[in-house]
């Protein structure tokens, strides 16, 4: 009886591990698919304390669109905390995303976001880079994303300068 119970426990443990690995691999595959096939969009970086931008081997990011969303939802962050929402966006001629009025004919695209704490979370707030290459990213003015048209998920694939040239 004890041996059967022990064997059943092992089977349950192995199945749980397989399930977790399958879920993680599915999430990774979804992000990779978005990065490979998504629409190129750029989000303007918002000003941030320069001493806080470069932290070792990563750069803290803040996006102007997130600031706009926070202002438009002022006073409701507590009620919205953790909830997923979609921001209607339009792209200018350069591919830079701007918040659109919800009923605008130009807002065929949506960007998925969530409130974390008191801030809008657009999927990332940091960009990691190779040790010793911080100087290269000091001229960053935009985050370069791939946007899934169907889900609204955006994957950061790099940073760009004022001319949208990759860094």
Model-assigned labels for residue ranges:
Residues 1-11:
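N-terminal positive-inside, membrane-proximal cytosolic segments immediately preceding the first
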Residues 10-27:
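Hydrophobic membrane-insertion alpha-helices, especially the h-region
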Residues 11, 79-111:
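Short peripheral tails and domain-boundary helices/loops at the edges of structured domains
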Residues 23-43:
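Aromatic-capped interface at the extracytoplasmic side
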Residues 38-40, 58-60, 82-86, 94, ...:
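Extracytoplasmic
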Residues 44-75:
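Short extracytoplasmic
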Residues 67-79, 95-99, 153-156:
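Short, Lys/Arg- and Gly-enriched loop/turn segments at beta-strand edges
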Residues 99-102, 110-167:
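Extracytoplasmic/periplasmic terminal helices and flexible tails
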């Amino acid at each position: 009886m004890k041996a059967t119970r022990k064997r059943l426990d092992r089977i349950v443990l192995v199945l749980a591990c397989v399930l977790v690995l399958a879920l993680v691999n599915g999430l990774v595959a979804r992000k990779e698919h978005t990065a490979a096939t998504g629409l190129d969009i750029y989000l303007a970086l918002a000003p941030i304390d320069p001493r806080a931008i470069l932290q070792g081997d990563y750069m803290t990011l803040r996006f102007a669109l997130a600031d706009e969303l926070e202002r438009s939802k002022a006073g409701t962050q507590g009620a919205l905390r953790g909830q997923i929402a979609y921001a209607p966006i339009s792209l200018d001629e350069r591919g830079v995303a701007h918040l659109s009025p919800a009923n605008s004919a130009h807002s065929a695209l949506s960007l998925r976001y969530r409130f974390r704490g008191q801030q809008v979370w657009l999927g990332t707030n940091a960009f990691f880079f190779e040790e010793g290459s911080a100087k290269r990213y000091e001229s960053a003015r935009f985050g370069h994303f791939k946007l899934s048209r169907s889900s609204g998920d955006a994957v950061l694939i790099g940073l760009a300068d004022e001319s949208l040239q990759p860094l």
